[in-house]
A protein has these predicted regions:
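Actinobacteria-biased recognition of intrinsically disordered, low-complexity terminal regions
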Residues: 1, 156-157
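A transmembrane-helix-recognition feature enriched in membrane-embedded lipid enzymes
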Residues: 132-156
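A structural signal for short, hydrophobic/glycine-enriched beta-strand patches
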Residues: 1-136
Length: 157
């Protein structure tokens, strides 16, 4: 079984599905096959808004064997840990990680670390929207912490 894991995105300015998140969801829908499990991951940035996972679930239109919502993931590390938990729960032999191109390498490194000691393959499926200056700066800062975060992800089960 494959797990299609869609990582949420929000800038916290709206209660609606962010266009970056919508693009990730569309990419996931193009990847899904009958029998795949789908993980929609993302939290609510404000108390008055819906979690990204719920917004994606409402917009999801493709058939999937099972749709799992992870409303607790607040960071890429949280996403990776949720992906690993879901992959173990459904017995996935492959995880297709769906995110933005500018986020993909770091997200897949953390997912692989979280799945350390498993035989689960991680494949990356990305969208091609350009990164904002803020996103590029955040990615650069997060890359400096990647070794520590990867060890944390590998040790957390």
């Amino acid at each position: 079984m494959r797990l299609i894991a869609v990582l949420g995105y929000s800038d916290g300015r709206t209660n609606a599905l962010h266009p970056v998140c919508a693009a990730r969801l569309a990419r996931a829908e193009s990847e899904v096959r009958p029998g795949d499990a789908v993980l929609l991951s993302g939290w609510a940035r404000r108390r008055t808004s819906s979690p990204e996972a719920d917004l994606m679930a409402r917009a999801w239109t493709s058939p999937a064997g099972r749709v799992i919502l992870d409303r607790s993931a607040r960071s890429t590390v949280g996403n990776a840990l949720g992906v690993a938990r879901a992959a173990r729960r459904v017995g996935a032999h492959e995880v297709v990680l769906v995110t933005s191109g500018w986020h993909g390498r770091r997200a897949s490194a953390l997912a692989r670390a979280a799945l350390f000691h498993s035989r689960t393959k991680v494949t990356l499926a990305t969208t091609d929207e350009p990164a904002t200056s803020a996103a590029r700066l955040r990615e650069l800062a997060c890359w400096t912490l990647l070794p520590v975060m990867a060890v944390l992800a590998a040790r957390t089960r």
